[in-house]
C-alpha cells in the first residue's frame, strides 16, 4: 500500500490486470487497497481473452490515455511476464508473489526485484 500511495502522490497512475473473475478482483482490491485510486481494475471479463493475451493492457492504456512506453508492468508470474511481452511494455517481475524466481527468469523480464521499494528506483531513474 505504501508503494502505491507514493506512486500516486507523485502523480503516476496505477491499474490492476488480473485473471480472477471481475467481481472477485474488484472485491479484493476494495478490501486490500481501499484508499488507492486505481485508473482501472480489470479481472476476467466476458468476451475478453485472459492474460497472457495483451487485450487487458491495451484496455488500460486507452483508459489511462498513455502509450506503451510509459508503462511498467509489475507482476508475480510467468503469465504476467508473457502479457508484458505480448503488449510490448516494460516488464518487472516480483519475487514476493506466488511463483518462484526461476519462472520469472524464464521470460527474461526487463527487471526482477525483491522489494516493493525497488519499483520506485526503476520508475524514477
Model-derived segments and spans:
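Catalytic-core regions built around general acid/base machinery
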Residues: 2-11
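Substrate-recognition "cap/lid" segment bordering the active-site pocket of phosphatases
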Residues: 15, 21-73, 78-87, 101-103
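Structural signature of beta-strand start/N-cap positions in the alpha/beta core
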Residues: 10-13, 70, 90, 110
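Short amphipathic alpha-helix with an adjacent loop that forms part of the alpha/beta core around
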Residues: 119-125
